[in-house]
Amino acid sequence: MKRKASAVWHGDLKSGRGQISTESTVLKDTQYSFGTRFENGPGTNPEELIGAAHAGCFSMALSAELGKAGFTADRISTSATVTLDNHPQTSWTVTKIHLETTAKIPGIDAEKFAAIAAGAKAGCPISRLLAAAEITLDAKLV
């Protein structure tokens, strides 16, 4: 399986602008810039997109692991906070991703849920891709 996305950049780093698109067209010429990445300007940025991908992947991995254990979630809600730090030796680096998930799962206890969530975090393809960063998880039943 292969998925495709593209980016086009115009101009210099600080005053330039770019567009990000995905093959599915969910993103089509979506604007990004230095301001959206480093100055909290309106628009998207690569780290936000990484966070969205990780939250989505983890939620699906958790659903799969719950299914293997005989459980079906009514709802899984996950957010990902991506930390981008500027280190003198390495420049800008994604150093940490914190996943926060809440789930409503009939018949499961907190201990079993925590173990399954930890396994989903370790097995999620995006977690494995981003293994150079510290990945933390806060998983709660609701």
Task: Annotate each PLM feature.
Residues M1-A52, S59-V142:
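Extended beta-strand/beta-hairpin segments
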